[in-house]
C-alpha cells in the first residue's frame, strides 16, 4: 500500500508500519525518512524529517488516531517538522537542540528545499508549506519508557553515539528496531565526547 501527496510518500512495509519518504529530492542530496507506526488506540510518528511540507496533515490521511511525535534525536533532518504537531517526545539530553536547528523561517526552509529538489519539482514548493520553529510542548523520554499503542508496545532505548540523547524504539510485536541515525556507518558524531567520558 502506497499513499502520496505533493511532499510525502508512505509505503506500508509491515501491517500498520509506514516508511515515509520525500521522493522529489535530487540525487546526491541528504535523505531522511520517518516511520508512522499505527496501533489500535494511538500512533507514533518517529522523526519528522526536514520540515518540507505538513507531515501531520499527511499522517492524518493514513490514520485518525492520536499521533505522538517521537524523535530519535534533535538534528534538523529528523526534527525540523516537529512544529506542525502539538508536542514531541525526546530524550532530555537532546531537548536543548530542538530550537537550534535547521532553519528559523519559512523562507529559509524554502530556500533549502529548492536547493534539494529535482528541477521539475521546484515550482511545486511553497513557503507556506514549510514547517518553521514556534512554541510547542516537549516531553522528556527515558531509557525503558514504553509507548502503549493498543495492539503493540514500543520501548525506548537510550543509545547515544550519534547525539547525546539518541534513542531507538523497539517493537517486539514485529521484531523491529527503529534507529534514526544510530545504526549508520558514518554518522557517529559524538564519539570523541564518549571516549573522554569513559576515560574520566
Outline where the language-model segments fall:
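Short, hydrophobic/aromatic-rich segments at coil-to-beta transitions
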Residues: 14-19, 144, 153-155
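Metallo-beta-lactamase
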Residues: 42-45, 50-51, 139, 146, ...
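Active-site HxH/HxHxD metal-binding segment of metal-dependent hydrolases
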Residues: 50-148
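A short catalytic or substrate-binding loop motif that flags glycine-/basic-rich loops and adjacent residues
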Residues: 2, 27-29, 160-162
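Short beta-turn/strand-loop junction motif enriched in small, turn-promoting residues
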Residues: 23-25, 75, 154
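Conserved beta-strand hairpin/beta-sheet module of binuclear metal-dependent hydrolase folds
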Residues: 7-61, 168-184
Amino acid at each position: 500500500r502506497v499513499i502520496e501527496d505533493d511532499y510525502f510518500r508512505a509505503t506500508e512495509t509491515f501491517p500498520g508500519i509506514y516508511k515515509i519518504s520525500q521522493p522529489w529530492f535530487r540525487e546526491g542530496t541528504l535523505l531522511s525518512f520517518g516511520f508512522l507506526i499505527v496501533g489500535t488506540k494511538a500512533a507514533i510518528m518517529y522523526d519528522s524529517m526536514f520540515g518540507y511540507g505538513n507531515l501531520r496533515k499527511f499522517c492524518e490521511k493514513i490514520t485518525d488516531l492520536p499521533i505522538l511525535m517521537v524523535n530519535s534525536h534533535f538534528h534538523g533532518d529528523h526534527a525540523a517538522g516537529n512544529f506542525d504537531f502539538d508536542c514531541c517526545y525526546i530524550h532530555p539530553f537532546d531537548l536543548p537542540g530542538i530550537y537550534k536547528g535547521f532553519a528559523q523561517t519559512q523562507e529559509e526552509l524554502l530556500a533549502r528545499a529548492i536547493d534539494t529538489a529535482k528541477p521539475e519539482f521546484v515550482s511545486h514548493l511553497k513557503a507556506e508549506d514549510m514547517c518553521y520553529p514556534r512554541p510547542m510542548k516537549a516531553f522528556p523520554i527515558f531509557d525503558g519508557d514504553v509507548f502503549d499503542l493498543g495492539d503493540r508496545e514500543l520501548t525506548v532505548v537510550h543509545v547515544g553515539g550519534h547525539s547525546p540523547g539518541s534513542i531507538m524504539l523497539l517493537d517486539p510485536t514485529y521484531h523491529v528496531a527503529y534507529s534514526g541515525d544510530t545504526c549508520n556507518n558514518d554518522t557517529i558524531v559524538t564519539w570523541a565526547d564518549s571516549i573522554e567520558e569513559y576515560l574520566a
